[in-house]
């Protein structure tokens, strides 16, 4: 059942250990990490994506769909050197991803699904409540015991306030016994879900399981453009929304670290099965990096 008391989000500084943050993630399905991106990186990143964001027109439909008064931009790796050289090199991000997705001795168990700037305009309506794992519809059938398929580091680029529509999350909803579509009237929680706003300053983020019920709030302001950077990460066995290895130029990919190349699909993920090495997203049984002319990895990512 939905929580009886008003929910609250646990908060930790980015200096906290990955184990502390992961414990809160397991308990609530979501947790705020304060100072996840350093202030100077946030400022430079925002400046670097500004030209692209200014070219995007806003569709106003008044029907509450995903395009209503919201700008979206997914070519962060192309537009922003700060993004590809600094933000995605966060050791804390990878330490948490390893705890959520990876198995010992099997390399990176995850890669990027999308990396998107989301800018919610004044007057934007509230988003319907949903779970991100509904992107892969069959996952809900596994309920709370199912493995994580998708998670998100949702980072504030501008302040998140209740007035400008900060995301509303339902802590603990990753443990509800039934994962039905929560907007259907046969859902036990239909119309009863209590949520908490993710109030954040630029550089803060909330880490959220794909099982957690959430939705953007109503931007009731007349001036606030609420900008975020969503780092959506999925299990390596799943196909991502963005075809990064086809859209990001090789010139930029060559400048990335080995683990970032893997995150964007320029290197294969490695898994050991019955003594054999299997390459996900490989080429003729080998790491796709060989086909692309990248240097051999120093370790099996």
Swiss-Prot record:
InterPro entries xrefs: Phytyl_CoA_dOase-like
Q: Where is this site: Important for reaction specificity?
A: 232
Pfam families xref list? PhyH
Keyword Oxidoreductase on entry: yes
Q: Which Enzyme Commission numbers does its entry carry?
A: 1.14.11.-
What family is it from? Belongs to the PhyH family.
Q: What does this protein do?
A: Multifunctional dioxygenase; part of the gene cluster A that mediates the biosynthesis of the fungal meroterpenoid acetoxydehydroaustin. The first step of the pathway is the synthesis of 3,5-dimethylorsellinic acid by the polyketide synthase ausA. 3,5-dimethylorsellinic acid is then prenylated by the polyprenyl transferase ausN. Further epoxidation by the FAD-dependent monooxygenase ausM and cyclization by the probable terpene cyclase ausL lead to the formation of protoaustinoid A.
Annotated protein name in UniProt: Multifunctional dioxygenase ausE
């Amino acid at each position: 059942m939905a929580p009886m008391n008003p929910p609250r989000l646990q908060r930790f500084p980015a200096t906290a250990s990955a184990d502390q943050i992961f414990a809160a993630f397991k308990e609530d399905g979501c947790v705020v990490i304060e100072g996840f991106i350093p202030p100077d990186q946030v400022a430079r990143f925002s400046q670097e994506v500004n030209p692209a964001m200014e070219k995007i027109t806003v569709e106003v439909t008044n029907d509450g769909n995903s395009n209503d008064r919201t700008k979206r931009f997914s070519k962060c790796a192309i537009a922003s050197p700060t993004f590809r050289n600094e933000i995605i090199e966060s050791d804390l991000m990878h330490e948490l991803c390893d705890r959520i997705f990876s198995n010992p001795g099997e390399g990176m168990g995850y890669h990027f699904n999308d990396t998107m700037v989301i800018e919610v305009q004044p007057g934007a309506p509230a988003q319907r409540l949903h779970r991100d794992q509904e992107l892969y519809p069959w996952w809900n059938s596994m309920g709370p015991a199912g493995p994580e398929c998708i998670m998100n580091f949702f980072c504030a680029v501008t302040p998140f306030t209740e007035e400008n529509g900060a995301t509303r999350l339902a802590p603990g909803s990753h443990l509800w016994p039934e994962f039905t579509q929560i907007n259907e009237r046969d859902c036990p929680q239909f119309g009863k879900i209590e949520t908490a706003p993710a109030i954040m300053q630029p550089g803060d983020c909330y880490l959220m399981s794909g099982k957690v019920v959430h939705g953007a709030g109503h931007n009731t302001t007349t001036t606030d453009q609420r900008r975020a950077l969503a780092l959506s990460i999925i299990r390596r066995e799943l196909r991502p929304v963005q075809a990064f290895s086809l859209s990001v130029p090789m010139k930029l990919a060559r400048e990335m670290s080995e683990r970032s190349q893997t995150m964007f699909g320029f290197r294969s993920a490695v898994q050991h099965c019955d003594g054999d090495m299997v390459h996900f997203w490989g080429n003729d049984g080998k790491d796709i990096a060989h086909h692309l002319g990248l240097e051999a990895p120093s370790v099996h990512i």
